[in-house]
């Protein structure tokens, strides 16, 4: 395989270019070799294909010659069929690893097994499982106590086993490490399993005379061997077992009470650890991926809230929605606003539509009708904005008409009828109150005309203003209210007759 060497950072430019050039040349050489090999292989394949074609042609010619021959071909069987090869005996040995070796050494050529993993890279001969299982030092020990076992031996190691338990490690390799090798003794706290009991004193035939232990001491020391079938490990292993005792595939032990002493079951371990190249565990599942570990991650069924159906009262209750606040009113010029029509909301749609744009401003009021001059007045002037009560407008109109001498004025009583629309500017309606007052009083000595003329009214108004300023107010009866009210439009005196 071609590997491209990396160029260091501190390499110069020339060195970098040189290394890149060397790498490219090497890549070309490797590519040429690969193409040459592929071409050579293709040539070999073509040669094999041509040989097959030639063999096929020969077979076709033989078939054609057989079809054209007139002879009858018969096949005769021998009197006895050839003997079937004997089936190889069922192997009772452990796993054979070096199966491709030409020579399998015998047991006399192998050194004695001092450790359980001495046979990992050597072939094994047929052995007696019962004998091997009874040997406590046959199987691989846990990694936690392997070093101690090699140094101090089996007796001191057995005392350490019964001295106390250790805390469970965070990441055990497999379930076999949870127990001591060859026994059902848990190696950690809170671990147990469905294993058969096995005496620790197998080397001294289970007797108490050699070990010097009493029955109470042995019972206390073997507390770690007792099975706890209701533990988490055993219940997890059996929770998915769908085969009960009545199932035809269920395993049953034909145990006879009469042959209780002679019957002996072969006990097989569930795992054979430290066998490189083979599975560690064939029956038990890894506790790291067991389903009981997922209970802390997945939500439980009772914690999932269920959707409750609404009651009749809730279903009949009207749905209320919160409307957005109305937009602020727009400031418009003071003008008569049209009356707002009430809107009845019968049902609010589920989707709130955006607020409607504000209504357009009302049209401006129509201009006032054009002023028509009255037939009774011969003086016309354009109205201006009154600032001092109308006196300046009146004096300007008099000056524009050529003075008071040229004004053609007449009394109100001389015209019984007044036709035309009231425009609020006629002199006759403006001097109505002043013309009625001198009827009952004597004419002013300085008046230049009759009691109802314009100049006399002006002179009286000026005298009254002057007296009011000086504080000399004469007690006069108040004028009628009707005299101060201007006539309505289209007024006709005939209606009052």
UniProtKB/Swiss-Prot annotation:
**Matches recorded under Pfam families:** WASH_WAHD (PF11945)
A Gene Ontology biological process noted in the UniProt record is: determination of adult lifespan
Q: Name one GO cellular component term.
A: WASH complex
Top-rank taxon of the source lineage equals Eukaryota
Regions of biased composition (Pro residues) lie at 323-339, 351-372
Please give the tissue specificity annotation from the record for this chain. Answer: Expressed in several neurons located throughout the body.
**Comp. bias regions, Low complexity:** 341-350
Q: Provide any one GO MF term from the record.
A: actin binding
Gene disruption phenotype? RNAi-mediated knockdown positively modulates lifespan; effect abolished in hsf-1 mutant background. Increases resistance to both heat and oxidative stresses. Increases localization to the nucleus and also DNA binding activity of heat-shock transcription factor hsf-1 after heat shock. Increases in transcript levels of heat shock protein genes sim-1, hsp-70, hsp-16.2 and F44E5.5 after heat shock, but not in unstressed conditions. May also moderately decrease levels of post-translationally modified hsf-1 under heat stressed conditions.
Report which residue ranges the record marks as coiled coil. none
Boundaries of every WH2 domain copy: 390-412
**Region: Disordered, residue numbers:** 306-497
Q: Which UniProt keywords apply?
A: Actin-binding
Q: Report the family membership.
A: Belongs to the WASH1 family.
Function recorded in the entry: Acts as a component of the WASH core complex that functions as a nucleation-promoting factor (NPF) at the surface of endosomes, where it recruits and activates the Arp2/3 complex to induce actin polymerization, playing a key role in the fission of tubules that serve as transport intermediates during endosome sorting. Acts as a component of the DHIC (ddl-1-containing hsf-1 inhibitory complex) which modulates lifespan by sequestering the heat shock transcription factor hsf-1 to negatively regulate its binding to DNA and its transcriptional activity.
Q: Enumerate the PANTHER family for this protein.
A: CXYORF1, WASH COMPLEX SUBUNIT 1
Quaternary structure note: Component of the WASH core complex. Component of the DHIC (ddl-1-containing hsf-1 inhibitory) complex, which contains at least ddl-1, ddl-2, hsb-1 and hsf-1. Within the complex, interacts with ddl-1. Formation of the DHIC may be dependent upon the Insulin/IGF-1-like signaling (IIS) mediated pathway.
UniProt-recorded name of the protein: WASH complex subunit homolog 1
Gene giving rise to this polypeptide: ddl-2
């Amino acid at each position: 395989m071609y590997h491209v060497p990396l160029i260091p950072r501190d390499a110069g430019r020339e060195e970098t270019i040189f290394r890149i050039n060397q790498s490219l040349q090497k890549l070309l050489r490797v590519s040429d070799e690969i193409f040459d090999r592929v071409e050579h292989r293709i040539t070999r394949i073509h040669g094999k294909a041509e040989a097959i074609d030639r063999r096929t042609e020969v077979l076709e010619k033989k078939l054609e010659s057989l079809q054209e021959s007139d002879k009858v071909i018969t096949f005769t069987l021998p009197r006895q069929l050839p003997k079937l090869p004997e089936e190889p005996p069922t192997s009772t040995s452990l796993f054979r690893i070096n199966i491709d070796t030409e020579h399998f050494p015998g047991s006399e050529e192998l050194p004695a097994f001092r450790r359980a993993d001495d046979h990992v890279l050597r072939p094994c001969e047929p052995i007696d499982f019962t004998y091997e299982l009874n040997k406590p030092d046959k199987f691989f020990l846990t990694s936690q106590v392997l070093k101690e076992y090699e140094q101090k031996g089996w007796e001191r190691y057995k005392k350490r086993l019964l001295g106390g338990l250790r805390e469970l490690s965070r990441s055990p390799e497999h379930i076999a490490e949870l127990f001591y090798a060859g026994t059902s003794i848990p190696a950690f706290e809170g671990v147990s399993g469905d294993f058969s009991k096995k005496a620790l004193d197998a080397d001294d035939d289970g007797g108490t005379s050699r070990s010097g232990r009493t029955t109470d001491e042995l019972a206390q020391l073997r507390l770690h061997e007792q099975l706890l079938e209701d533990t988490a490990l055993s219940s997890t292993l059996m929770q998915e077992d769908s085969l009960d005792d009545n199932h035809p595939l269920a395993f049953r032990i034909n145990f006879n009470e009469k042959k209780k002493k002679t019957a002996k079951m072969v006990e097989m371990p569930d795992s054979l650890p430290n066998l490189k190249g083979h599975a560690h565990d064939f029956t038990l599942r890894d506790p790291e991926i067991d389903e009981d570990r997922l209970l802390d991650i997945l939500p439980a069924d009772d914690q999932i809230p269920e959707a409750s159906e609404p009651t009749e009262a809730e279903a009949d209750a009207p749905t209320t929605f919160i409307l957005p606040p109305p937009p602020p009113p727009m400031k418009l010029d003071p003008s008569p606003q049209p009356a707002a029509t009430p809107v009845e909301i019968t049902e609010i749609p589920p989707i709130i539509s955006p607020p409607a744009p504000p209504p357009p401003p009302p049209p401006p009021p129509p201009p006032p009708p054009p002023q028509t001059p009255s037939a009774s007045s011969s003086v016309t002037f354009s109205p201006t904005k009154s600032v001092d009560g109308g006196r300046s407008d009146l004096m300007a109109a008099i000056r524009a008409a050529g003075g008071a001498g040229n004004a053609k004025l007449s009394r109100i009583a001389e015209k019984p009828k007044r036709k035309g629309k009231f425009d609020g500017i006629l002199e006759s309606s403006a001097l109505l109150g002043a013309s009625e007052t001198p009827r009952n009083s004597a004419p002013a000595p300085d008046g230049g005309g009759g009691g109802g003329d314009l100049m006399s009214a002006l002179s009286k108004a000026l005298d009254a203003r002057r007296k009011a300023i000086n504080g000399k107010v004469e007690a006069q009866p108040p004028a009628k209210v009707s005299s101060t009210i201007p006539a309505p439009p289209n007024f006709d005196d005939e209606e009052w007759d």
